[in-house]
């Protein structure tokens, strides 16, 4: 993992298209701004993990449903 230090209003450039900027620092909370192309999804980690979990559940349910439908046609 790369660890970088930044101060207020400083930024980090990721590739040609993504900039992460420190917007404010209040106590133990840091607000960041992210400029990236529209086609790049950006989520908080806990939201991303929740989306992945839901997608896995949906995929599993689809396989189970297909199995049930397949056995009903026989």
Swiss-Prot record:
It comes from the Bacteria. GO terms for cellular component: cytosol. One of its GO terms (molecular function) is mRNA 5'-UTR binding. Its main location: cytoplasm. It is found in: Cytoplasm. Keywords: Bacterial flagellum biogenesis, Cytoplasm, Repressor, RNA-binding, Translation regulation. Belongs to the CsrA/RsmA family. Homodimer; the beta-strands of each monomer intercalate to form a hydrophobic core, while the alpha-helices form wings that extend away from the core. This is Translational regulator CsrA. It comes from Bacillus pumilus (strain SAFR-032). The gene is csrA.
